[in-house]
Amino acid sequence: MKFKSLPMFALLMLGGCSLIPDYQQPAAPMQAQWPTGQAYGGQGDQRSIATALPKAKEFFKDPALVRLLDAALENNRDLRIAAKNVESYRALYRIQRAERFPTLDGQASGNRTRLPDDLSPTGDSRIDSQYQVGLVTAYELDLFGRIRSLSNQALEKYLATEEAQRSVQIALIGDVATTYFLWRTDQALLELTEATLTSYVESLAMIESSAWAGTSSELDVRQARTLVNQAQAQQALYTRRIAQDVNALELLLGSKIPTDLPKNSPLAMSALGKVPAGLPADLLLNRPDIRSAEHQLMAANANIGAARAAFFPRISLTASAGSASSDLDGLFNSGSDSWSFAPQISVPIFNAGKLRANLDYAELQKDVGVATYEKSIQTAFREVADGLAARGTYGKQLSAQSELVDNYKAYFSLAQQRYDQGVDSYLTVLDAQRELFSSQQKLLNDQLDQINSEVQLYKALGGGWSVSQN
């Protein structure tokens, strides 16, 4: 008798087995330290290491931008879609997890059948009645971990979607910030253009008066009009760009831009906090997009377990208990108890290679997941390296450009003095004025590029999102 119970004992022991391959995190395909060299200004040195980024509201110092970020996080439609996707995958996980437990259903049925006389054993027609009420339970013995594997896969996909939502949030914060700074820059460029246009118009009027007096040539007049036309074209350009910036911001916000925004602070690096130097390279592994890719990889790994388990028998147990009677009034009388027990085993014998192909597909999907995970790390490393290179060079570039603006201001002032003294023609003044305007535009655009590069670096490092927030 003891030996007869061994097969059942072995089956029960198998219930603790799993055919999911042991998961091993792929080695990160990146350097242990950030790049070094002239462009990076020694930022790859990690002797003094910071461990975390400032949170978004600590990093962005501009009160108006902080107000816009709050509005975007509340109303942005992409963020709402991402949140609904998380809820959807959570529901799918709950559905799959429920498969690991027995089901219990209430059931009631009634059946009346008339048997004609030519089919009746007695030769007389009769009506048979049968009524039944009870409970039905069903359960699949997950001896080889098929259901557990599918549940783990659903869980990892749900977790991947959660991380994807965080990625959307970080991207949204970065997009709102860069669009806001572009809007501010275009406003400054329009203001500069309008001031320059006013100066050009005044110069044109003066040259036209001089031309009537015979002291200026037609060439001087044409040159002055050319500058006026160029400034008018750029005035229209920046007016259009400001409108487009507003449209882009309102799309990101999911609502109109508030009319009572705090007063703008000067557009400079002071609008941002400091991304600490010396952050370790493995901090990238905490980026939500990389964590999402790893959860997708773990989901693919779990699916291999389900594909392997499909080669083995599936055992289902169905049982019912209740009351049955040929008379509705006697359904709950003594002696009307009924029950049934129906175990079922299904063994795959021939499927034209379907199960083998399904396993191959699952293993290939895992390989795809590994490559995707590795690429996400490499992409993140490249984004941070680009940001560090920008940080290491924009300071010198802006310093040189700012000095260039100062030199053109001096050049314009000297040219004006020499014209007033009759030493040079007004063409020299116009040339100096044009170069000054161009250098001032370039300085504003360089300031924008520097600010946006720091925002992108902050975003590339994970946007202040720490694992403890997960």
Curated annotation (Swiss-Prot):
Q: Which InterPro entries match?
A: OMF (IPR050737), OMP_efflux (IPR003423), RND_efflux_OM_lipoprot_NodT (IPR010131)
Q: Which residues are the lipid attachment points (N-palmitoyl cysteine)? A: 17
Segments of this protein annotated with the region Disordered: 104-123
Which subcellular locations apply to this protein?
Cell outer membrane
Query: Which Gene3D superfamilies does the record match to this protein?
Result: Outer membrane efflux proteins (OEP)
Keywords, A to Z, come to:
Cell outer membrane, Lipoprotein, Membrane, Palmitate, Plasmid, Signal, Transmembrane, Transmembrane beta strand
* Lipid-carrying residues in chain (S-diacylglycerol cysteine): 17
Identify the GO cellular component terms for this protein.
cell outer membrane
* Record-stated family: Belongs to the outer membrane factor (OMF) (TC 1.B.17) family.
Q: State the function annotated in the UniProt record.
A: The outer membrane component of an organic solvent efflux pump. Involved in export of a number of organic solvents, including toluene and styrene. This is the most important solvent efflux pump in this strain, although it can export AMP and some antibiotics.
Q: What is this protein called?
A: Toluene efflux pump outer membrane protein TtgI
Organism (species): Pseudomonas putida (strain DOT-T1E)
